[in-house]
Swiss-Prot record:
This protein's record includes keyword Repeat: no
NCBIfam families: tktlase_bact
UniProt induction comment: Up-regulated by salt, sorbitol, and abscisic acid (ABA).
Protein name: Transketolase-2, chloroplastic
Residues found modified as Phosphoserine: 428
Record lineage: Eukaryota, Viridiplantae, Streptophyta, Embryophyta, Tracheophyta
Job of this protein: Catalyzes the reversible transfer of a two-carbon ketol group from fructose-6-phosphate or sedoheptulose-7-phosphate to glyceraldehyde-3-phosphate to yield xylulose-5-phosphate and erythrose-4-phosphate or ribose-5-phosphate, respectively. Could act as a stress sensor involved in adaptation process.
UniProt organism field: Arabidopsis thaliana
Amino acid sequence: MASTSSLALSQALLTRAISHNGSENCVSIPAFSALKSTSPRTSGTISSRRRNASTISHSLRPLVRAAAVEAIVTSSDSSLVDKSVNTIRFLAIDAVEKAKSGHPGLPMGCAPMSHILYDEVMKYNPKNPYWFNRDRFVLSAGHGCMLQYALLHLAGYDSVREEDLKSFRQWGSKTPGHPENFETPGVEATTGPLGQGIANAVGLALAEKHLAARFNKPDNEIVDHYTYSILGDGCQMEGISNEVCSLAGHWGLGKLIAFYDDNHISIDGDTDIAFTESVDKRFEALGWHVIWVKNGNNGYDEIRAAIREAKAVTDKPTLIKVTTTIGYGSPNKANSYSVHGAALGEKEVEATRNNLGWPYEPFHVPEDVKSHWSRHTPEGAALEADWNAKFAAYEKKYPEEAAELKSIISGELPVGWEKALPTYTPDSPGDATRNLSQQCLNALAKAVPGFLGGSADLASSNMTMLKAFGNFQKATPEERNLRFGVREHGMGAICNGIALHSPGFIPYCATFFVFTDYMRAAMRISALSEAGVIYVMTHDSIGLGEDGPTHQPIEHLSSFRAMPNIMMFRPADGNETAGAYKIAVTKRKTPSVLALSRQKLPQLPGTSIESVEKGGYTISDNSTGNKPDVILIGTGSELEIAAQAAEKLREQGKSVRVVSFVCWELFDEQSDAYKESVLPSDVSARVSIEAGSTFGWGKIVGGKGKSIGIDTFGASAPAGKLYKEFGITIEAMVEAAKSLI
């Protein structure tokens, strides 16, 4: 019997089932502790083009020794396995055909390996997709998403019913054109941009390894699950996959098993036109165990043996190269790029049905297949119930560790965590906001169990080291400093995986703000997939000085303000930095970017942690009746300039309001009344100042206001000289204000 605390933990996890649109009717998930346990082969012909292409291909790339794979005995009836595999194929074919859009080739080729994974290997509870100790699966080749939807449907997930398959790629459906974790319970990560999925999988596997090292005991391995992924040639070509797989090998992520769909076909044709490297040897060099399944089309025992071998290797991740035929079973399109991203067409669908001996109507699941897969509901319930009992015993014996683990699993922050954040007064010493950020990071790491992160080889510049913890490494996975090396893109995507593993994981990652250009795709996926990663971006302007325009961000603030579901903070001092972290920690479905200075800044009068929650607020004002002569608006290092310009104008008898615009997105969320109290509509004299692009400031200052900024690239010179030459000065702001009054 699960403990009361375990029941509460179950209830806390139910919130994960609520879709991003706020509906609570998207999926029905009972509390996991309440679930009770109940207890001749069609080979198909292969296009001769596959054999010819294979011959050409292997003449150009060196043969790779296949790891030994033993024949194993399975209890599954081979004819039923064939039938189940073909069910997966035809659910994908039929859905793509009905939508007149999609990618049937990958599901047709990968159906055997995915069937064995979902039906024979993975542990999960289809009635609670968010059960903590489930195995995770990430379809990195996200265009083949009908493969995963078919699997979820057969496994009994309520999120993918027959009507959902029939509405594939349609408005409002639970089966979008690429996997979306926020739309479809059972989907772990949002994939589609190639390489992002395997990177997320590395993050998920890192999270498991970290939690296992922290919380497992000799008598109770409370954290014990695998991460599986399917990636294709396109994922392999993308640079991000090499970045993250290099780290996975370095970290020894033994519970990460990736299936490489080796079908030799890309959108433009055979991969020989652009991709002839030995993937096997590359992964061996990256520190992976490599297995080659030569017959991925129907070599079920080979696949089973490969998985068994992969699980036996505990000190490194495994790549299982599975040679498949894209569009397997299609007489005229198999092994062709034409089957990659378009419906087969009515005639070819019929020909494929005949070829594979499939007499059923579209979307039909044969009764014996349905009956076979139905066991996953009671088996999944039993798995979760067993784990609940295990957790109850763990909690009784190890209450402190259990409390920390529950916080990470549920996302419930410890009581009073925010009190750990530092506060400042105007008399506190001035400092660069990157240094003030480090104080916040270290305070949060001590107060929040799931807080961890690192930098892309710039920890000493980004100031992101957690002083109370060591480095997460192969031998010390319990530590919380992540060393990503110079791999910005991979870093961001790995952090997405960590954030998506459990609601209480709060990963941060860091580099120079300008190098977000190397990781923008991962940051966009953060926003789309509602992964609350904290991006610590230092050296946020020309204020970094002599390194010059290659390192000086200009358009970056504007670009992130334009990105949906991301908060762009530019704090001016210690209180605003702490306030930004407070919000970033609590907003678990929205990533945050903190743009931080290299140069020292003063602690300003009028700032506060609490005020940051408004996004924009008044820090000083000598006007009456909410009608200042002019409003000066600044962010970050330029808020000090706005404050000093205000003093100059006040000396000349002007009434001036100074507004900190630390986060546009939060200001947009405020009531109209609050916005009017800060930026009264009848005060058109407004001047903004920011050491970056002026793009977008028009909506803040209005048609009659002025924006001071930089709309060219920077230059190499000392910071003070740059500010003067680019006109980011007190004098420029005073003159602009006077011209409007």
